[in-house]
């Protein structure tokens, strides 16, 4: 099951857990109130998983690819890692399914505090359009993930501040309604 927690304010190695002291765990319900959705699937059978197919059909995830993030597999690794960790939002949902390895998604809560979501094999997450977030590997420096999209793949990050964008405005309205 996924584990999430409020982060400390340390600015050292982002691949470390950065748990706030005292510990402040975050449950799935709190993530749901932020619009973050989570599923635990069997990554060993992702190619023929009826549960994954059901989710894809229900949520119209029509396009997929697989990305491997590691020094020896990803061209321009250092540049990409820095880009993924830059705080940003997207105009569409960001959907990731971890097939192997592990990493962290960080999302902002209603008070603009960081929540770290530990992702490992079998974890699938959907971040809503308009949420500020970032991604980093953990100390293992490796993840293989399925990227899912509604329609044609678009992965355009809008670095913070991007509060003027319609996706951000709609997300803030969603937060106000779910409070």
UniProtKB/Swiss-Prot annotation:
Q: Which CDD domains match?
A: cupin_ARD
Q: Tell me the InterPro entries matching this sequence.
A: ARD, ARD_euk, RmlC-like_jellyroll, RmlC_Cupin_sf
Q: Which GO terms describe its biological process?
A: L-methionine salvage from methylthioadenosine; methionine metabolic process
Biological pathway: Amino-acid biosynthesis; L-methionine biosynthesis via salvage pathway; L-methionine from S-methyl-5-thio-alpha-D-ribose 1-phosphate: step 5/6
Identify which top EC class this enzyme belongs to: oxidoreductase
Q: Which Pfam families match?
A: ARD
Q: By its UniProt entry, which SUPFAM superfamilies does this protein fall under?
A: RmlC-like cupins
Q: Name one GO cellular component term.
A: plasma membrane
- Keywords on record: Amino-acid biosynthesis, Cell membrane, Cytoplasm, Dioxygenase, Iron, Membrane, Metal-binding, Methionine biosynthesis, Nickel, Nucleus, Oxidoreductase
Q: Which cofactor does it need?
A: Fe(2+); Ni(2+)
Which membrane topology term applies here? Peripheral membrane protein
Spell out the molecular function terms from Gene Ontology.
Answer: acireductone dioxygenase (Ni2+-requiring) activity; acireductone dioxygenase [iron(II)-requiring] activity; iron ion binding; nickel cation binding; oxidoreductase activity
The similarity annotation says: Belongs to the acireductone dioxygenase (ARD) family.
Summarize the subunit comment.
Monomer. Interacts with MMP14.
Per the entry, what this protein does is:
Catalyzes 2 different reactions between oxygen and the acireductone 1,2-dihydroxy-3-keto-5-methylthiopentene (DHK-MTPene) depending upon the metal bound in the active site. Fe-containing acireductone dioxygenase (Fe-ARD) produces formate and 2-keto-4-methylthiobutyrate (KMTB), the alpha-ketoacid precursor of methionine in the methionine recycle pathway. Ni-containing acireductone dioxygenase (Ni-ARD) produces methylthiopropionate, carbon monoxide and formate, and does not lie on the methionine recycle pathway. Also down-regulates cell migration mediated by MMP14.
Q: Mind telling me what this protein is named? A: Acireductone dioxygenase
